[in-house]
Amino acid sequence: MLRSFPLFIGLRYSLAQKNSLLLSFVSLISVLGVTLGVLILIVALAVINGSIETLRKEALKSTPHVTIAGPGLQANWRELRDLALRSEGVIAAAPFIEAEASITHQGEAAFIAVRGIDTALESSVSEPGSATFVDLLASLGESETGVILGAGLAGQLGVRSSTQVSLLSLGKLLRRRLDEGQGAEVIGFADFGLYSNHNTALMSLTAAERLFANDPGVDIRLRLRVSDINRAGDIAAQVFSDYSELEITPWNEVQASL
């Protein structure tokens, strides 16, 4: 009885007699208004969910699923990587260093994040990329001074493949050690996602260690790729439960808005 009462009221006012045309009209308009409002809400939620998913994919092109940092990692990152690879939920793990630097080309300059990577392992922890990106990583591993720039950054600086650029770590720049910059050859460009295309460059781990030599706070970290990004933090916490000194940062803390 209670379930049919609202239906009874709706039909009563929508199907009123001819002497109640105004009431029927108002009721009909109200029903149509509610229906249209619900439809707009459904469409808006679908668009928002789709946009968030797109932004998440763009962010994960450059943001690690999980970043592991902390004292002692410099010395035993290989053992910790092996531990991660033996653990359930971890697909791949690779070392990297990352710090800020200035890049200069023909009077154009920008401050960027330079990431030093293990070129043999990077493709395993990155979001699935094109065959071109895999080839670029192979070329980067063969070059002592090579660098891969974000496509947006390359356009901003007006550089092409095989162009020479100058790099200087932010630490050395602040200490006015301008003579310790190093040259690098642009071997190609990559899509690092919406958030990083204009401010990211990749170098080999060895070249990046030379660039940031003697800069404080630039230490090796581990990057993990996990099977379930929604549980990234929990998976890493289980893997390194015996290492309380390590700092575990999942992607959704770095990109909290997503």
Where are these regions (language model features)?
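N-terminal Sec/SRP start-transfer signal
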Residues: 1-39
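Alpha-helical membrane-interface segments at transmembrane helix boundaries
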Residues: 15, 33, 48, 52, ...
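Hydrophobic, regular-secondary-structure patches
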Residues: 39-113, 123, 134-143
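Envelope-exposed proteins and targeting segments
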Residues: 62-64, 89, 108-113, 145, ...
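Short amphipathic alpha-helices in soluble, non-transmembrane regions
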Residues: 79-85, 128, 235-243
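Hydrophobic secondary-structure segments that place a key small or acidic residue at a functional site
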Residues: 97, 135-206
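Cytochrome P450 core scaffold surrounding the K-helix E-X-X-R motif
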Residues: 120-129
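Mechanotransmission and gating elements of multispan inner-membrane complexes involved in transport
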Residues: 174, 178-258
